[in-house]
Amino acid sequence: MAVNNFSFTFLGTGTSAGVPVIACDCDVCTSEDPRDKRLRCSACIRFTDAGGIDRVILIDTSPDLRQQVLREKLERCDAILFTHQHVDHTFGLDEVRRFNMVMNQAIDIYAEQATLQHLHRVFNHVFESNKNVNDSFVANLIPNELQPDEPLCLF
């Protein structure tokens, strides 16, 4: 598929605790240098597809996702690719529910089996309607299992 306006943006490149780290007085954490202020790991790919639709693919959903999305002025999310199941890469998943509302559609998520199982366990209120005891607005997600060494075609 031909794409235009392709960009890859690191949304966060910090450690699992972010930088600065809470209650740390080391030189990096107390630095005034803006390069020493780093959010946790996420990234996004933006492009215009062959049909002229602007697309956004998130890579991981860090706990800092809301702040990252606001900073980058992202207004949609067409898919999410999870690299692995660590909480610093998954705990921002709840934030994507606003994209569901804006786009009026579900979001495909892609991950290996172990990561999908982790997401189902941690966010059971999203994947199992009977676990959403308050009937609150939750993300509308479509899980897709990735197979190791197999190509991935999103659109």
Where are these regions (language model features)?
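Binuclear metal-dependent hydrolase catalytic cores
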Residues: 2-155
